[in-house]
Every structure is written in C-alpha cells, then in structure tokens.
Design a protein with these regions (language model features):
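A short beta-loop-alpha structural element at the N-terminal edge
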Residues: 2-18, 148-164
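Active-site rim helix/loop that mediates acceptor-substrate recognition in acyltransferases
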Residues: 18, 29-53, 57-66, 165-190
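Conserved acetyl-CoA-binding loop-helix of GNAT-fold acetyltransferases
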Residues: 81, 87-100, 123-127, 219-232
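Conserved active-site alpha-helix within GNAT-family acetyltransferase domains
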Residues: 88, 92, 108, 116-134, ...
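Conserved GNAT acetyl-CoA-binding A-motif
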Residues: 102-113, 232-246
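C-terminal "cap" of GNAT-fold acetyltransferases
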Residues: 108, 115-117, 137-162, 260-270
Length: 270
C-alpha cells in the first residue's frame, strides 16, 4: 500500500474540516465542524499547518492528523483513519514518522487525549511511547436558566489571561490552558471581585473554558459559588471533556452532572 503524506498547508479550512469529518466517520464520538469553527477551534489551540498532515492512497483520502504547538511542546489534537483503512496496523506506520519529524524540528514533548474506552487507540499510543497522565471528564450544567440577581460582571478577557497564564505554566490540559482563550469567541465574568470564569460561544451552547480564583481567596467557596451562578445564568452550560477528574467534587457540589464520556491525557518525551 503506497500512502502519500501531504502537509495541511496545501488545504483550506473548508477542505480540512471535510477531511476530518470523513475520517471520523463511524467513531463513537463523531467530529463535525464547519470551516469557521474548525479555524477558530484549532487556531485557538495553536494549529501548526506545516506539521499537520493528510495521507492519501492515490486520490483516496486515508487519514488526517492535526498538530498544535506551543514552543517545544506539541499535541496530537486530532487523528483519524477512514473506515476502510482501520484495523490494518496503518496508524503506527503513519504516526511514527510524523512524530520523528516533530522531534527533528525541536519538539521535546508530545501530548494527546484519547477516549477512555478506545482500547485500540490507547494500545497504539502506548506502543509509540506515550504514558497516561490523568483521567479527564466533562460536566453539564442545568438545561434551563434561572432568573435572579446578576452577580457577574463583564471584564476585559485579557485580565484573566494575564492573571492566570504565568501561574498555570502547562499544568492544565491543553484545551483549558488560558493561552487557548486568546483567539476564541469568549467572554470573561468576574464574581465577587476575586473569581473569574471564561465562557466560550464557539459552539451552539455555551462552554465553560476556565475558572480562576485569586490565590489568597482559595478555599473559601468562591469556585463552587461561581460555578453555581454560571449554570443558572447560562442554559446548557457545559465543559469540554478536558477537566481533570479530581475536580469532580467541585462540579457536582455546584449542581453539575458528570458526562458519561471520559478521556485519558497521555504524554511522550521525544
């Protein structure tokens, strides 16, 4: 089987969104993004078009890999094979050279997330040198909003990024890092002057992307109170399936339900 890799530089956001949807056909969690949402989502996550890749067999689409980068760390933000090519051991053949090229370009650490019940995917990534870091969850707020006093104040989104970025320093999952907020459509809300939340409107329902409580006010219930206020304010508010599982008590105490889906965060040192 002669497979040809081509850099994503050769394609538009419309084409890449189409390729991604085709390659995720039949997956337990299908991916379908409009060109605009593709560009906004992966642009915010730091897509590297030069490193992202589309594979072909002749004129037939085989697979796609979306790579995002920050300095010497890269992430496999999305990877999928067309249904006809699955179960044939192709992925390792495609990804190993891709990761080696990243190493040659100065990448020292690779990150990814994989659905927790995708045993084949987990086995593949372990064979490629990845190790599990933690379990990631998603949380769903109330499906209808409740009226009441508006205790949230709009603030300059950059205030939150400035406050949080230095403290976070790569300790959060990639999608929740405040650096991923900069080019997303989002608003930041302040609660009681010492707690902040970023809510994105990229998708059809609002998404809670980040919360931050000033260090000296932590342990006083600010985060739980703010989460409660937020899901009463925004109907259908949810998080990405990217929140470390250790935060489950905080979300459940604030009235959120835990989504059924889980992901594993994995990392490899090159």
């Amino acid at each position: 089987m002669n497979l040809t890799p081509l850099s994503a530089l050769h394609y538009s956001s419309e084409q890449l969104a189409c390729f991604l949807g085709a390659c995720f056909e039949g997956y337990s969690v299908p991916v379908s993004l409009t060109p605009e949402r593709f560009a906004l989502r992966f642009g915010a996550e730091g897509i590297s078009l030069t490193d992202s890749c589309v594979w072909w067999e002749g004129e037939t689409l085989v697979a796609i890999a979306i790579i995002t980068r920050r300095a010497d760390t890269a992430r496999l933000a999305a990877y999928a094979l067309r249904p006809a090519y699955r179960g044939k051991g192709i992925s390792k053949r495609l990804l190993a050279p891709l990761f080696e090229r990243l190493r040659e370009k100065g990448v020292r650490q690779l990150r990814l997330e994989v659905i927790a019940d995708n045993s084949a995917g987990i086995g593949l990534y372990r064979a490629l040198g990845f190790e599990q870091q933690r379990v990631l969850r998603g949380y769903q707020g109330a499906t209808s909003s409740a009226s009441g006093e508006n205790v949230l104040r709009d603030v300059n989104p950059l205030e939150l990024v400035w406050r949080a970025a230095d403290e976070v320093k790569d300790t959060l999952p990639w999608q929740l890092d405040p650096l991923s907020l900069l080019t997303l459509p989002f608003q930041v809300y302040e609660y009681r002057r010492h707690a902040y939340a970023a809510v994105s409107t990229l998708m059809d329902t609002p998404s809670l992307r980040f919360i931050y409580v000033e260090p000296e006010y932590r342990g006083n219930g600010f985060a739980r109170e703010m989460l409660t206020v937020l899901h009463h304010r925004f109907a259908g508010l949810s998080t990405p399936v990217a929140v470390p599982e250790s935060f489950t008590p905080l979300f459940t105490q604030a009235g959120y339900s835990m989504m059924d889906i889980r992901q594993l965060e994995m990392r490899a040192v090159l």
